[in-house]
Structure formats: C-alpha cells, structure tokens
Amino acid sequence: MNMLNYQVVGITDYEPAVEFALYTRQLLFPEIYHGQIPKDLQNFEQFYVHDPLGCFITVKDQNRIIGTIAYRVYDHRFDLNLPSNTVEVVKLFVLPEYRRKGIATQLCNMLFSHAKNSAITTLYLHTHPFLPAAEEFWTLQGFEVIQREWIDTYDTIHMSKSL
C-alpha cells in the first residue's frame, strides 16, 4: 500500500468526495437509495465547507478516494437531549480492500482533532446492527450508546462522545 493522503475537503475539490459518498450510500442502503441525493450532498459547500460546524475528510491512495468521514451540524431530528452545538458524525466508509489497516481509526482521529480545534464539545452519530462491527468500532473510538430504537425499517443505535 502506498502512502495515503488524508485531507480536509475544500471548495475546489469536493466533487469527487460527493461522488464517493453517493457510491457508498448506494452500497450500504440500496433499498432507500432510489437515486435521491441527500440534502447535505446537494449543498456540500453549505454543510461541509462554509459552516464552522462542518468538516469532510477524505483519504486517498494516489488520486483515488478510498475512505471518508465527516461531521455536520446536528439537526436534533431525534429526541435525544443533546447540547445545542452538537455535530453529527456521518459518511464513515473505507473501501473493503483497505479495511482492517487502521484507516477508519486514523480518519476518526483527524476528525476529532478538527472538531476540538473548532471548539466542538459533543459528537453524535447513529448506526445500525446490520453494519458489521459498527457499534464495537465506535465504542473503541470513545462513543457511548445513549439510546436504541426502531425507526422505519432499521434498528438504530444512537451514540455520543464528549471531547
């Protein structure tokens, strides 16, 4: 494996990140994909570039994106009693052939550092039991389960981490 390049995505280089995020969404959630582009990806600059409570990180092997992670302002759509300046961790994905090499942990560490430097104190995420090892991974990153519930078609695990 070559040297990997981790970087925060900016205004000039976000289109490949959006394409990768759409590709991974289709892989993970084919039953809800239906070609619909989520609001944060339609308005990438607004959510991840211009908003001080937004960040999108890619990791590349040569010029190919092989993984991503991001956070954006949390919209409080779940009744979880989280602080008002909470951000939601989203879009963690590493291509299967690059997994089990510490890349996801490295992406998380970079994201946590960026969040601390932006004076963010609470991170929120949700995951699902059908994603192999997701809950265990996030627990190893310092997240704690705050609630489990059934939403629409998925069991959902809500987790948070204080920085």
Per-range role (PLM):
Residues 95-97, 101, 129:
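Active-site acidic-Proline motif in GNAT/NAT acetyltransferases
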Residues 8-90, 95, 108-110, 114, ...:
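Acetyl-CoA-dependent GNAT
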Residues 68, 105, 127:
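Ser/Thr-centric signal marking residues that sit
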Residues 85, 100-101, 106, 123:
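Charged, amphipathic alpha-helical coiled-coil/dimerization segments
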Residues 23-24, 121-163:
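C-terminal "cap" of GNAT-fold acetyltransferases
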Residues 108, 115-126:
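Conserved GNAT acetyl-CoA-binding A-motif
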Residues 2-6:
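Extreme N-terminal starter segment of soluble prokaryotic enzymes
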